[in-house]
């Protein structure tokens, strides 16, 4: 297979960075298709930890190019900060390519995000306030500024002046906030465009050419399927399509070009921000998992909400994203536990259901139906093969695979690349 997609199958933070780094060592190209610097990913390599929000994880290993596609929204300041940190640590970034059709997060988008969230009061979504949503709003409203616009001084000036009129009207008259000044933005962002120029190309052509040549291309999804703008827990979702279908439009490839879709999940479930979470643990067990696994947001630093593994949510993700392989992370967290629970269904108003409701009110009334399994005492962080795993760990993994209806391809027992048990090679599925 030459096209493998990696998507988060929960609410993000599943550890996609690790599996994409692991797979990218065999890839000619690693491609990101959606989101922006609201999507944190952590990579541990040779004792060094890299926390990134925008540059694709494949930057560490992909042989030819690392690509930021047209579906990504780019904060230039964040991007150049990450590039500088990578280069300072000896990582070659010369293969980075940026779509000329990608949209730019402008200062007014960040302000709008902040003001909108503030105005919602108790109904706030829990946005990272990085301007992601407003940038996608600009895109849908056809007033967005794209990378290609940033490279053309006259075009950029015209669009910026027009947009500032629109945004300042909103800021001053609706939110009662000060107007932004053209001169505080124009020179700085035009300079970003000039610095960006060497990376910019038509990435749709680049990626399709690689696929036509049967090169291995790894597609990195951001966030998680349960945050998808259409299929997630709306309105507590992100602003882009995080399912595998969003990869095609976010890169500019045909939907039939993906060979394999790997869904990444944790051995439990986490969520950041507001929204329904049927298996959430608000007790000592939840606190224990959070501290063992250091469940704090890469972007925000906020403590993540923690719950038991939810197979109902995973089956939903499998269906809407066409997942045909599971990559499970953080199995080692349960070493030393007595029992582990898996949610097998929900109870809604006294009725047992096995699907994920669209209605928020229904979701908030759902109670998880649990199956309890024994855990294990052994430290598994040095385990290299399936046969070395404790029997109870194998039973837990097999039950997850059975409930979701998807085979496991990798199991992670620690943060490093080497702490990965490979059951099936995604490149050969």
UniProtKB/Swiss-Prot annotation:
One of its GO terms (cellular component) is cytoplasm. It is an enzyme of class 6 (ligase). IMP binds at residues 13-16, 38-41, 128, 142, 223, 238, 302. Pfam families: Adenylsucc_synt. One of its GO terms (biological process) is 'de novo' AMP biosynthetic process. It catalyses: IMP + L-aspartate + GTP = N(6)-(1,2-dicarboxyethyl)-AMP + GDP + phosphate + 2 H(+). It is found in: Cytoplasm. One of its GO terms (molecular function) is GTP binding. Coiled coil: none annotated. Mg(2+) binds at residues 13, 40. Belongs to the adenylosuccinate synthetase family. This is Adenylosuccinate synthetase.
